[in-house]
Amino acid sequence: MNNLQAQFPHIAIKLNEPLSKYTYTKTGGNADVFVMPKTIEETKEIVTYCHQNKLPLTILGNGSNLIIKDGGIRGVIVHLDLLQSIERKNTQIIAMSGAKLIDTAKFALDESLSGLEFACGIPGSIGGALHMNAGAYGGEISDVLEAATVLTQSGELKKLKRSELKAAYRFSTIAEKKYIVLDATFSLELEDKNIIQAKMDELTALREAKQPLEYPSCGSVFKRPPGHFAGKLIQDSGLQGHIIGGAQVSLKHAGFIVNIGGATATDYMNLIAHVQQTVREKFDVELETEVKIIGEDK
């Protein structure tokens, strides 16, 4: 794998890179090989090479709804953060995989285009948002997604239309097929900029009031169980404020687990398991994680 640097001298590649620098929890071990392509073509080159040489491949976006285990990740990590372009075409916006969802929503506001207001505070990348059909406050990415350009695991380029992008709550075809998102096209509607801004301000105020934005966290930890709210179940289980190591069930919103100082990924995972077990015993409800957990134990 170390041959990658010689094979691709034009692409930024780091060895044994600490992944805690790239996750919102500020936890995670090291990557064997950490690749930062600047273009779609460079991304395609790396993905194809990994496939041909049977190298394990992991795609990393903004690291916001993610826990990377303390043992890190073997093989090659491709970090798409440098694919940042956002542009307008009529009433559509085309955003590359590494563009931040927040920046894309702000771009839509600046262009007087409505439809992405719900995303104004979601801290993920476009690629990650498509992967999990991210949403908040009644809106989901799939509501406005028109098309996506993806790579297959073998490096084949595909253009997927809306009809091919079947999506459900925190699920998408992209995740199911392990596609690598390169860009996304959103169909929006013209609207008065002040109206869009007012909606964003309202949602931002709600987010700031309810979410522990002052601490590192992985966002909403659990999916919403049918007929319940995860945060309410956790609160009613007496777990709000519960601490394991440096990880704590947030005092502000029980659906979040925050890093109050020096937390490890293992702390997070132990606390998640404890919450799941307690809620299962008290309410006979299974809490399924929304946060993605990858990597190896230390």
Swiss-Prot record:
Q: Which GO terms describe its cellular component?
A: cytosol
Against Pfam families, the record matches this protein to:
FAD_binding_4, MurB_C
Q: Which prosthetic group or cofactor does it need? A: FAD
Q: Which residues form the active site?
A: R170, S220 (proton donor), E290
- Which InterPro entries does the protein's record reference? FAD-bd_PCMH, FAD-bd_PCMH-like_sf, FAD-bd_PCMH_sub1, FAD-bd_PCMH_sub2, MurB, MurB_C, MurB_C_sf, Oxid_FAD_bind_N
Q: Which residues form the signal peptide?
A: none
Cellular compartment(s): Cytoplasm
> In the Enzyme Commission scheme, what number(s) does this protein have?
1.3.1.98
Lineage top rank: taxon? Bacteria
- GO molecular function terms noted in the UniProt entry: FAD binding; UDP-N-acetylmuramate dehydrogenase activity
Similarity annotation: Belongs to the MurB family.
Classification via HAMAP family:
MurB
> What is the protein's given name?
UDP-N-acetylenolpyruvoylglucosamine reductase
Organism of derivation = Listeria innocua serovar 6a (strain ATCC BAA-680 / CLIP 11262)
Q: What gene is behind this protein?
A: murB
